[in-house]
From Swiss-Prot:
Induction: Induced by anaerobiosis, there is no significant expression in an aerobic environment. Expression is further induced in the presence of nitrate or nitrite.
Record text on cofactor binding: Binds 1 [4Fe-4S] cluster per subunit.
Record carries keyword Iron-sulfur: yes
Annotated organism of origin: Bradyrhizobium sp
Identification of the protein by name: Respiratory nitrate reductase alpha chain
Assembly, per entry: Heterotrimer composed of an alpha, a beta and a gamma chain. Alpha and beta are catalytic chains; gamma chains are involved in binding the enzyme complex to the cytoplasmic membrane.
Chain's gene name: narG
Signal peptide segment: none
Catalytic reaction equation(s): nitrate + a quinol = a quinone + nitrite + H2O
Length: 902
């Protein structure tokens, strides 16, 4: 390379020196960032960006990743520190065993013996493994810089929405700073403005046509009267029996056909099992999908019709419901706002009191956002994007940074991956006993018209029993010991019902590609106390037991592990990477051999499976196991529970795959574990039309999918059948796009599941931050309670508070302070010469997150569990904490080392 590197758009970057290399390998940082590295004499010499990505279209800049560097991990002194310590200890003890370092062979045998004992004594599902984000290195799973976005920052108007002046804010045109946890109110007010001005006052044809074709706005919803004159929106598909539908009538929502002035059900909804509906057709004719019943109504905003049983019902459209939900004045009377200055829910004036953002700014940004989308046809939060037709349009759409990254080539990848998959959020919530510390009951979050379970833990159990979510351990007994018994005899007792029974506790836990205790587990101190039984910093009261006071120290998963195995980094193994952030499949290439004694994850588990197969002989042979599987998304089973939520414990019969999980009897040949681990089995021959004598025939599969959906999809996979791993090493390839199916087969504004209605979330609503009230411990001295926002910009062990709060507390810049609540505590300071520590590495319980019962819904069209798709998540959330000054640490020689007890 010359001293000046030239990149896309003809800009350059000085490199200051010539570089020499022997080979160039394409790899990545391993998370979202993409790039390449080169090596010389077996050493990675430098890292730089690659530019030969496929084009993203003529109206978008070419992809230009400026990814993060990883070589500092590769050659970190930490990788050799244990080796150095062992060598030093070896000089004193002479014996390598006394020097506490083991060999791969010994460790494999120890782990294998432990697994055999656990499987034999407690059951196979008491052995667990945890690894996050399969898409970031999918082969390793099966065995942070966001600077790329800066390339698209030019020539666009960027608005930052952040309670604090974040790093990204300084690059934006406008900064909206809502109070923590109130951004939903701001977004709803923007939606109010858009609907008022671009749907009602001056309707945009583009917006209305988009909503008609690509959203569930035209579908009809029944209204039932409850508690006096109050009406409650009910299921969207309760009318279909009157239309003579026979096949899955409960899954075929109804709309008003303007062409015939009658009710109709389009093909392509979930009841049609995959038929495409975006062409707005009935079986044999075009539909004119009416957005609103205004103008044809029998009563205010509704139409009354007669059902097949002779009764009558009031119906309206999802569009009309949404208008009412946003508080739009449409001449129907009632307490509707006259303009944006009325203090009525969801108006700009209403949100101003909640968020602190001036109403004028909300009106301005909403108008500019919608006007731009109207003029450019979508090149512009999720509701806002749909209202202006900006989803699925190049240059528009909704992008997010947190969440689950999509593993794109799942069909082929699953043939070598997966044991019994578990949703980790519920798993760690149950086994770390976080349900013990809930201060807000489910009843307090429910709609006043709902009467369901009282506790968050109850929803986890309900979801496991009904087959909504996977559960591990599955059953309250070891299925290997129940040979000869019918699975029905012992599968009605789920382990989730008694998570603290010693027999239902996880025994062996493998963790790879993750700092589970520091970040991924969500609930650090609870995991230390209940999952591991070690020292912890929980300060909340539980059952009257006062938590212990502990010495604060840095925590990580390795520090609490019995065995630590050295693994290869992203530059030392071959793998693949996909992301929501870009449409490419990117390789990770082995530029150098694994350093020290490390091995790739795949090689580690291969050697473990080989030793396990040897050790289990005489203890485990061919055994009969029972596996429960949740009702899966994108399968016929997702139509299993169309109506009420009924628990088979007292409300209906237990029917596997219908009212409870699917139950499968599986033969485990434990001595053949290694042979099976290193082979591709017969499952690749199954599917809708796969031909895998040598490899999967992609075009054949897509031809079958085209016949299934009624649309030609083969062009999406053309020229893909010959692509190999070496091809993406030369240049990343674009992924194959495919349709996703929902209940209405459109993007949904309205969700009619019973649990969504119970929690009042069938339509978008604003929920203020939850006040946990008495959850904090008692303190003495001057204090202030703040609404603490979990930092998202990856800061270190420092805390920012306002100047006003600091003055009230007597805190100055660079002081030691203590931040604590019932989940734990942390201390923070920024002394001179201190380096920054990235988030998720420090101990202190800052990653204690809640989940939502509505994420547990299953067996209901798109609301059905699927791997890497849908399930409970540990959400980023607001938290109330106490901050107090601890300046007694200064002047006592504690600037660098904090005493454990004061």
């Amino acid at each position: 390379f010359s001293p000046i590197d030239r990149y896309n758009d003809n800009h350059t970057q000085e490199t200051y020196e010539d570089r020499e290399w022997e080979n160039v390998y394409r790899s990545t940082h391993g998370v979202n960032c993409t790039g390449s590295c080169s090596w010389k004499d077996g050493i990675v010499t430098w890292e730089g960006q690659e530019l030969n990505y496929p084009t993203t279209g003529p109206d978008m800049p070419d992809f230009e990743p400026r990814g993060a560097s990883y070589s500092w991990y590769l050659y970190s002194a930490n990788r050799g520190v244990l080796w150095s310590m062992w060598q030093e200890e070896l000089q004193n003890n002479e014996s390598p065993l006394d020097a506490w370092k083991s060999s791969w062979q010994e460790v494999n045998e120890l782990i294998a013996a432990s697994n055999v004992y656990t499987v034999k004594t407690y059951g196979p599902d008491r052995v667990a493994g945890f690894s996050p984000i399969p898409a970031m290195s999918m082969v390793s799973y099966a065995s942070g810089a966001r600077t790329p976005d800066a390339h698209f920052f030019t020539e666009v108007r960027v608005v930052s929405v952040s309670p604090d002046f974040a790093e990204s804010t300084k690059l934006c045109d406008l900064w909206l700073a809502p109070k923590q946890g109130t951004d939903a109110a701001m977004a709803l007010a923007m939606g109010h403005v858009m609907l008022r001005e671009f749907h009602l006052d001056n309707p945009s044809d583009y917006f209305l046509n988009y909503c008609r074709q690509y959203t569930d706005f035209p579908f009809l919803v029944t209204l039932s009267k409850q508690k006096g004159d109050q009406f409650v929106a009910d299921r969207a598909a309760d009318l279909v029996d009157a239309l003579g539908q026979e096949n899955n009538p409960e899954w075929k929502p109804v709309l008003w056909n303007e062409n015939t002035n009658d009710f109709a059900t389009p093909h392509g909804t979930m009841g049609s099992r995959g038929k495409w509906n975006l062409e707005q057709r009935l079986e044999d004719e075009e539909t004119g999908e009416k957005l609103s019943v205004l103008g044809i109504e029998d009563e205010i905003g509704t139409v009354r019709l007669q059902l097949a049983d002779g009764s009558t019902a009031l119906v309206t459209t999802v569009y009309d419901l949404t208008m009412a939900n946003y508080g739009l004045e449409r001449g129907l009377g009632g307490q509707e706002p006259k303009d944006f200055n009325d203090d009525v829910p969801f108006t700009p004036a209403w949100q101003e009191k909640i968020t602190g953002v001036p109403r004028e700014l909300i009106i301005q940004i909403a108008r500019e956002f919608a006007d731009n989308a109207d003029k450019t046809h979508g090149r512009a939060v999720l509701n806002l994007v749909l209202l202006v037709g900006a989803q699925g349009v190049n240059g528009g759409g909704w992008a997010h940074y947190v969440g689950q990254e999509k593993l794109r080539p799942a069909e082929g990848w699953q043939t070598i991956a997966m044991a019994k998959h578990m949703n980790s959020t519920s798993y760690f919530y149950n086994h770390s006993s976080q349900w013990r510390y809930e201060t807000v009951t489910a009843q307090e979050l429910l709609s006043p018209m709902a009467d369901k379970y009282q506790h968050h833990g109850d929803y986890n159990v309900l979801a496991a029993r009904m087959g909504w979510l996977p559960s591990a351990p599955q059953l309250g007994t070891n299925p290997l010991r129940q040979a000869g018994m019918s699975p029905v005899d012992y599968t009605v007792k789920f382990a989730a019902e008694q998570p603290e029974n010693g027999k239902n506790h996880p025994r062996n836990l493998f963790v790879w590609r993750s700092n589970l205790l520091g970040s991924s587990g969500k609930g650090h101190e609870y995991m230390l106390k209940y999952l591991l039984g070690t020292e912890n910093g929980i300060q909340g009261k539980q059952g009257g037991v006062k938590p212990e006071e502990v010495e604060w120290k840095l925590s990580s998963t390795c520090l609490y592990s019995d065995i630590v195995l050295p693994t290869a980094t992203w530059y030392e193994k071959d793998d693949m990477n996909t992301s929501d952030m870009h449409p490419f499949i990117h390789p990770l290439s082995a530029a150098v051999d694994p350093a020290w004694e490390s091995k790739s994850d795949w090689d580690i588990f291969t050697s473990l499976s080989k030793k396990f197969s040897e050790v289990c002989v005489g203890h485990l042979g061919k055994e009969t196991d029972v596996v429960t599987l949740p009702i899966q998304h994108d399968s016929a089973a997702e139509l299993a529970q169309p109506l009420d939520v009924k628990d088979w414990k007292g409300e209906c019969e237990p029917i596997p795959g219908k009212t409870m999980p699917q139950i499968h009897v599986v033969e485990r040949d434990y001595p053949a574990t290694y042979e099976r681990f290193t082979s591709i089995g017969p499952l690749m021959e199954k599917g809708i039309a796969w031909n895998t004598q040598s490899e999967m025939d992609l075009l054949r599969a897509w031809a079958a999918l085209s016949e299934f959906t009624g649309r030609d999809h083969t062009h999406l996979a053309l020229n893909k059948e010959d692509e190999k791993f070496r091809d993406i090493q030369a240049q990343p390839r674009t992924v194959i796009t495919s349709p996703a199916f929902t209940g209405s087969e459109k993007q949904s504004f309205y969700l009619d599941h019973d649990m969504m209605k119970d929690f009042g979330e069938s339509l978008l609503v604003y929920r203020p931050p939850i006040d946990t009230r008495k959850s904090r411990p008692e303190v003495e001295g001057k204090e202030i309670t703040l609404n603490y926002l979990t930092p998202h910009n990856k800061g270190g062990p420092i805390v920012w508070i306002s100047e006003t709060d600091a003055r009230d507390l007597g805190i100055e810049d660079n002081d030691w302070i203590e931040v604590f609540n019932s989940n734990g505590a942390l201390t923070a300071r920024v002394p001179a010469g201190m380096t920054m520590m990235y988030h998720a590495q420090e101990r202190g319980g800052i990653h204690n997150s809640v989940t939502r019962p509505t994420h547990m819904i299953g067996g209901y069209a798109q609301l059905a569990y699927g791997f890497n798709y849908y399930g409970t998540v540990g959400s980023n959330r607001d938290e109330f904490v106490v901050v107090r000054n601890i300046n007694w640490l200064d002047g006592e020689g504690n600037d660098q080392v904090q005493e454990s007890v004061k």
